[in-house]
């Protein structure tokens, strides 16, 4: 059984938020996963859907696999780098803003 993978690095969403979406499509058929992502209201769903479409294209074009037989065999979200920003506050103080990123990896197979 061959697994085809695609990765989106430095996606502009936190890993915690993206994992909520990833848990919904793990071990589902590719068609069902696309339906779930299409009707989800989360920003991370759009990012995961782009990676899923990319890995489907890779499997079809590079390996000649049939899309109807494919399942999401692995999907995981790792934390990327965090950009640190400053928000000025009263009396010369500052609060830190953490702009988190994540790495989205989707693998499909039979």
Swiss-Prot record:
Show the GO cellular component annotation of the record: cytosolic large ribosomal subunit
What keywords appear on the UniProt entry? Ribonucleoprotein, Ribosomal protein, RNA-binding, rRNA-binding
GO annotation (BP), single: translation
Which CDD domains does this chain map to?
Ribosomal_L22 (cd00336)
Q: Can you provide one Gene Ontology molecular function annotated for this UniProt record? A: rRNA binding
Q: Which InterPro entries match?
A: Ribosomal_uL22 (IPR001063), Ribosomal_uL22_bac/chlpt-type (IPR005727), Ribosomal_uL22_bac/org-type (IPR047867), Ribosomal_uL22_CS (IPR018260), Ribosomal_uL22_sf (IPR036394)
Which protein family is named in the record? Belongs to the universal ribosomal protein uL22 family.
Stated role: This protein binds specifically to 23S rRNA; its binding is stimulated by other ribosomal proteins, e.g. L4, L17, and L20. It is important during the early stages of 50S assembly. It makes multiple contacts with different domains of the 23S rRNA in the assembled 50S subunit and ribosome. The globular domain of the protein is located near the polypeptide exit tunnel on the outside of the subunit, while an extended beta-hairpin is found that lines the wall of the exit tunnel in the center of the 70S ribosome.
Q: How does it assemble?
A: Part of the 50S ribosomal subunit.
> Which protein is depicted?
Large ribosomal subunit protein uL22
Q: Give the organism the record lists.
A: Vesicomyosocius okutanii subsp. Calyptogena okutanii (strain HA)
